[in-house]
Amino acid sequence: MSLIPSIFGGPRSNVFDPFSLDMWDPFKDFHVPTSSVSAENSAFVNTRVDWKETQEAHVLKADIPGLKKEEVKVQIEDDRVLQISGERNVEKEDKNDTWHRVDRSSGKFMRRFRLPENAKVEQVKACMENGVLTVTIPKEEVKKSDVKPIEISG
């Protein structure tokens, strides 16, 4: 996965990355007035995910502060598509309360990643600690090819 932001929509999407299924938003850079609610929710809706590959596994880490593990779903779709989704509900308002500021976001999020052929999708594990979701996908062992030297005659 490229660490350089895409020219088509910043770091959240990269049209050249075969593993990313995030959609390019052609209207993202247009400055069209939107509701203040959608702008405030964008930090939650556009959940950032880091993906690294080690010798043994693919490891994805998502910052999802304020959610319980019961509010987050991790699933494999269509054999090789990892989907991370969740929802934070709006806090109930008491009509007698006076709000001075509302910065915490609410809403739904969903991120999808196409897993490579060497991923053991039947052994995926997920854990959540301190608002960070970690998904570990073990890799198939790379078969070492048998090398047989051929003598050159002549």
Curated annotation (Swiss-Prot):
sHSP domain span: 40-154
Keywords: Cytoplasm, Stress response
PROSITE patterns in UniProt: SHSP
A matching Pfam family: HSP20
UniProt GO BP: protein complex oligomerization; protein folding; response to heat; response to hydrogen peroxide; response to salt stress
Localization (cell): Cytoplasm
Domain of life (superkingdom): Eukaryota
Gene Ontology MF annotations: unfolded protein binding
Annotated CDD domains: ACD_ScHsp26_like
Disulphide-bonded residues: none
Recorded GO CC terms: cytoplasm
InterPro entries: A-crystallin/Hsp20_dom, HSP20-like_chaperone, Small_HSP
Subunit structure: Forms oligomeric structures.
Family: Belongs to the small heat shock protein (HSP20) family.
PANTHER family found in the cross-reference section: HEAT-SHOCK PROTEIN 20 FAMILY MEMBER
Name under which the protein is recorded: 17.6 kDa class I heat shock protein
Source organism per UniProt: Glycine max
